[in-house]
Amino acid sequence: MDSNLRNLKDFFTLYNKVTELCFSRCVDNLSQRDLGGHEDLCVDRCVTKFARFNQNMMKVYVDVQTTINAKRMEEMEENARKAEQQQREQEKERLKEAAATAVLTPVQPPVAGNLSM
């Protein structure tokens, strides 16, 4: 729910910035209720320009983020392979040490006890 709320907040922040920017650039006369012809055209162009810019920037962001994510996945897979290889090598070393210890350690024969009943 927090991400949805954050997205909504970001949307309204962006909307307010576009509104403020285009209003300050395009509206010259506040004495009339309706926009004049040139004001209407200016606002339309301003909003269209901003929307296209935002869309192009998001395309670039998605492309770059996709590349970054692919590199991260490759790095994670490489690190996992290295860790697995290192674990195998450590296991081999432990087995070698265990085998060497088993060969060097004499086995005591069982002590004959009293078998009478």
From Swiss-Prot:
Protein family according to the UniProt entry: Belongs to the small Tim family.
Gene that this sequence comes from: Tim9b
Gene Ontology cellular component annotations, sorted alphabetically: mitochondrial intermembrane space; mitochondrial intermembrane space protein transporter complex; TIM22 mitochondrial import inner membrane insertion complex
Pfam families: zf-Tim10_DDP
Subunit structure: Component of the TIM22 complex, whose core is composed of Tim22, associated with peripheral protein Tim9b/Tim10b and the 70 kDa heterohexamer. In most cases, the 70 kDa complex is composed of TIMM9 and TIMM10.
Twin CX3C motif, short sequence motif: residues: 22-46
Annotated membrane topology: Peripheral membrane protein
Keywords on record: Disulfide bond, Membrane, Metal-binding, Mitochondrion, Mitochondrion inner membrane, Protein transport, Translocation, Transport, Zinc
Domain of life: Eukaryota
Protein name: Mitochondrial import inner membrane translocase subunit Tim10B
Keyword hit for Zinc: yes
Stretches for region Disordered: 75-117
Protein source organism: Drosophila melanogaster
Comp. bias (Basic and acidic residues): 75-97
